[in-house]
């Protein structure tokens, strides 16, 4: 009986954690979608604005943190990057670096 209760608890815990992971993924996609207005669908630029898709995660994170701190001058990107936490910046870096 104890074994069944333990297995049931593990199953419910797994379901709860998968829901949390899904919520994080939705949040990341939502904030990443704001980038797509200028950087194109999926981060693939259709114009003069640089593409984000396919850049390495570290590069995206570094650029966003430099924009946020003011180390890299840019009026528009500073305003955008300033609204994100470091965790959100990391998540966006991973999102655009991963193949879709």
Which residue ranges define each predicted feature?
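The canonical Cys-X-X-Cys-His
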Residues: 33-41, 92
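Repetitive helical segments and hydrophobic/amphipathic motifs
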Residues: 12-13
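Gly/Gly-Pro-rich "capping" loops immediately C-terminal to redox-active cysteine motifs
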Residues: 28, 42-72, 78, 82
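N-terminal signal peptide c-region/cleavage motif recognized by signal peptidases
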Residues: 16-21
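Detector for the c-type heme attachment site
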Residues: 38-45, 97-98
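Cleaved targeting-peptide boundary
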Residues: 22-30
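Bacterial N-terminal signal peptides that target proteins for export
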Residues: 1-9
């Amino acid at each position: 009986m104890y074994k069944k209760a333990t297995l049931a608890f593990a199953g419910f815990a797994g379901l709860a954690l998968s829901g949390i992971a899904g919520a994080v993924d939705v949040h990341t996609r939502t904030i990443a979608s704001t980038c797509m207005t200028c950087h194109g669908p999926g981060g693939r630029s259709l114009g003069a604005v640089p593409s984000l898709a396919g850049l390495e995660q570290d590069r995206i994170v570094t650029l966003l943190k430099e924009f946020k701190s003011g180390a890299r001058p840019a009026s528009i990107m500073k305003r955008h990057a300033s609204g994100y936490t470091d965790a959100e910046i990391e998540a966006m870096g991973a999102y655009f670096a991963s193949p879709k």
